[in-house]
Amino acid sequence: MALLEIIHYPSKILRTISKEVVSFDSKLHQQLDDMHETMIASEGIGLAAIQVGLPLRMLIINLPQEDGVQHKEDCLEIINPKWIETKGSMMYKEGCLSVPGFYEEVERFEKVKIEYQNRFAEVKILEASELLAVAIQHEIDHLNGVLFVDKLSILKRKKFEKELKELQKKQKRE
């Protein structure tokens, strides 16, 4: 397994609309394993393939258990997701491995239902609510070239851009 480089905002790569996965082979399995290792090493709960430069419609989500540990066997590998149903609305404070250090409330659906394939091309149905529903929406947005900061109000977006510039200036001085 290998750690992959996470692409950061404002890279144009993150705006890529990812392509459907058609080959469910050992290369795909390796990419999923590398994505999981990268996500865990980066202390994330979700990662879309485009965030590591792979323009493929696949993502992983691994929520921690009550003991705070993320177990690999609990990792959801979601390939070629399709929306079936969305319900309700809620606000959730989100962050992103591609936008490090910035967290903001975003409006999301309260419940979602998707169809997807696993690493063996088996079709699955998943219903989710709360944090899992938020993570699914966040990661599927990545597959469509959308970042959570795109969903902010104009005022919050300006605040984000200002904080980003300050962070970039600080990094240049170091």
Curated annotation (Swiss-Prot):
<keyword id="KW-0648">Protein biosynthesis</keyword>
<keyword id="KW-0378">Hydrolase</keyword>
<keyword id="KW-0479">Metal-binding</keyword>
<dbReference type="GO" id="GO:0042586">
    <property type="term" value="F:peptide deformylase activity"/>
</dbReference>
<dbReference type="GO" id="GO:0043686">
    <property type="term" value="P:co-translational protein modification"/>
</dbReference>
<protein>
    <recommendedName>
        <fullName>Peptide deformylase</fullName>
        <ecNumber>3.5.1.88</ecNumber>
    </recommendedName>
</protein>
<dbReference type="InterPro" id="IPR036821">
    <property type="entry name" value="Peptide_deformylase_sf"/>
</dbReference>
<dbReference type="InterPro" id="IPR023635">
    <property type="entry name" value="Peptide_deformylase"/>
</dbReference>
<dbReference type="Pfam" id="PF01327">
    <property type="entry name" value="Pep_deformylase"/>
</dbReference>
<comment type="similarity">
    <text>Belongs to the polypeptide deformylase family.</text>
</comment>
<comment type="function">
    <text>Removes the formyl group from the N-terminal Met of newly synthesized proteins. Requires at least a dipeptide for an efficient rate of reaction. N-terminal L-methionine is a prerequisite for activity but the enzyme has broad specificity at other positions.</text>
</comment>
<feature type="binding site">
    <location>
        <position position="142"/>
    </location>
    <ligand>
        <name>Fe cation</name>
    </ligand>
</feature>
<feature type="active site">
    <location>
        <position position="139"/>
    </location>
</feature>
<feature type="binding site">
    <location>
        <position position="138"/>
    </location>
    <ligand>
        <name>Fe cation</name>
    </ligand>
</feature>
<keyword id="KW-0408">Iron</keyword>
<dbReference type="GO" id="GO:0006412">
    <property type="term" value="P:translation"/>
</dbReference>
<dbReference type="GO" id="GO:0046872">
    <property type="term" value="F:metal ion binding"/>
</dbReference>
<feature type="binding site">
    <location>
        <position position="96"/>
    </location>
    <ligand>
        <name>Fe cation</name>
    </ligand>
</feature>
